[in-house]
Amino acid sequence: MSLQMDKIYVKVHELKFVNNLERNSHYVKIYWDDKKYKSQTKDGGCYIFNETFLIPITNIYDQKDQIIYVEIWESNLLNKQCAYTFFTLNSIKIGQIIKENITFIEVLKKCTLGLSINIVRNQKDILFFNIKELLPTFQDQEIINAVWKNEDEASIIKQLINLNTIDGITNIGNYKNSQNYNETLQKPKENISIYKSGEEIENSYIPSSTPEYVSHYIYKGAGENSSNYINKTKDTLFPTYLNNYAYNNNIKNVYDTPNGAHYSSNNNSGSNNAYSNFDHNINNSPKNNVPFSNSDNDKIFHYSRNYMPSPNSEKMLYFSCGNKKKALLIGIDYCGTQNELKGSINDAIITNELLIKKYNFYDSSMNILKLIDNQTNPNYRPTKRNILSALEWLVQDNNPGDIFFFFYSGHSYKKYDYTCIEKGGYNQTIVPCDFKTEGEIIDNDLHKYLIQPLKDGVKLVSFIDCPNSEGILNLGYKYKLKKEKWKETYNPFHVLADVTQFSYSKINEFPTEINLLEHVLITNNIEALTYHYMIQSIHSYINLYNKKKKKKIFLMSSQKFNIDRKFDFNHILKNSNSELGQQKNIIKWKKNKKK
C-alpha cells in the first residue's frame, strides 16, 4: 500500500557551529531528485535562516526509497562543503521532524541545524506543521480541529491559547517576537540524548523523534536499487498475520528508546528496553505524519513469544555504560576480480546502522571504522596494511568496561602452518583486497592484533562471515549446537577478556539484498535476545536458502558461559580461566610431523 504525497515541506532554522568563533558566510543546500535547492547566504556568525522549501515528489510508486540530502556550505572564493546529513523518503513519510536541532556528519566543521521536514498535501497540512512548531505542547488533534475551523495562523493560535492580547496581531512574525510567545509558549525541548563520549549536544543528527530508519549511506543490493533496509526483508520472515505494511508502520518501536536508556542493573536480565518488540504500543503508532490525509484502518495484530532468557548464573565483573564503545567493520566484494563476491559491502554498511540505531554506538569516525573496497579514499580500503592498523586502533588503550565489535565479510583461505601449532597443519586466513601482492592475514596475526591486547573486564563481540572460519580467532571453547555443550578447542590461547565469535558462511543463493544480522537483530519478535536464540536463528536463516548441503553456525568463546545469557553490549563476564593453553600439543605435533 502506497500513500500518495505531493510535496516535502522543509523549513530551515538556525545553524550553529561547535566553534563559537566561526564568522564566515554559510548557506544550506538541499538535493532531491537530481535538483538543487539553495538558501540565502548568512554571515557574521549569525545563521538564522527561517526559510521554507516546498519540494515536489515524483515517482510515488517507485520501489526504491529516495533520499533527500541537506548540506552546509561555506561561501568563499572556492565554496567548501562543511557538513551534511540525509533522510530517506520513507522516514519522512512516517516520522514528524519538527524544529529538531540535528547534528550533521562532519566534513570540515561540526555543526547543528534546526530542521523541520514533513510531507504535505495541501495548505492545511502546512498550517498544521507551522502551528505544531509554534505550540509544541498542544495535542495533534487539538491543532487539527483548530486548523479546520480557521484559515490563518493567528486565528488558530487565538483559538488554541485563548489570549485576548493577540486580537491586534495581523502578522505571525510579530507574534513570535512578542513577550507572550517568548515567555508562555516557546518552551525548549528536553534533551533526552545521552552520549558515551561525555559530550552533550542538543540532539543526534538522527532526531530522536524520527521513528523510522534514517540511512546515512547509499548502497545497492544485487538486482535492485534499494536504500531502505527495513523493506528488503521478505514477507515470509514475518508471522502470516503480520504483513509488511504493518511492520513498516510500526518499526519505530525498535528505536523508541533514547540513547543510553537501555542500561539495566546486573541482576535485571528479565527485561531490557533495548529489545523493544511489536507488543509495545503497536496499535498506537500513526500510519503516517500527514494529519489531513485519509488512511485505511488496517487491523494490526500482536506478535508475542513466551521466550525469556534465564538469569545470568555467571558473575558480572563490569557493567559498561560510559566506557569506550568502538567497532571495526570490514566488507570486501573484490570488485572486478575473478573472486568477486556480492553483498559483503552491503552487509558492512547495514551492520554499521544496526550498531548506531539499536545498540547506541556513537556515529563518529572515532567510534566506528568501516573498511570497504569500493571506497575511493585509499586510507579506508581493506588492504592488508589498513586492516592491521585498524585492528590496532580498535583495541588500543583498552580498559575494563570497554566494549568492542569486529565484523568481517569476505573470502578466507588456508595457508600452510610452518610453526606446527595448528591441528590440521594449516592456518586460517582472511583475504584483504590487495592479497595478490601483499598476501593474506593469518589467524595467528588476527589473534595477536585483536585478542591478545585485551584486558580482563573488556568485551569483544565478533561476527565472521566467511567459510571455515570457526577457529580464526583462536579462542578456547566451541559450542556444540546438537549436543548443547561447550568443548575445549585444540591448543587454545589463554584469553583474559570476554570474547565471543559468531562464524558462518552464506551460500551463493543467499539473497545479497538481505542482511543476516539485520534479520536476527532487528526483525526478531522476542523481548530479549539470547546467545542460544542467536545461533539457532542464524543457522535456520542460512539454511533456508540452502537446498543441498547444510551450512553450520559456530559460536566460539574465550570462556564457557550459560548459553541462555542475554546478548547485549553491556554486561561483561569475569575471566574464569586461570590457565588455558596447552603448549605440550605443539611439541606433540612436531614429533608426529617428524615421524
Swiss-Prot record:
Residue ranges crossing the lipid bilayer per the database entry: none
An individual GO BP term: proteolysis
Family that this chain belongs to: Belongs to the peptidase C14B family.
Superkingdom of the source species: Eukaryota
Keywords of this entry: Hydrolase, Protease, Thiol protease, Zymogen
Residue numbers annotated as active site: H411, C466
Record-given protein name: Metacaspase-1
Activity regulation note: Activated by Ca(2+).
Inactivation phenotype: No developmental defects in mice and mosquito hosts. Not required for ookinete apoptosis.
GO cellular component: cytoplasm
Gene: MCA1
Subunit (UniProt): Monomer.
Function: Cysteine protease that cleaves specifically after arginine or lysine residues.
EC number(s) from the headed UniProt entry: 3.4.22.-
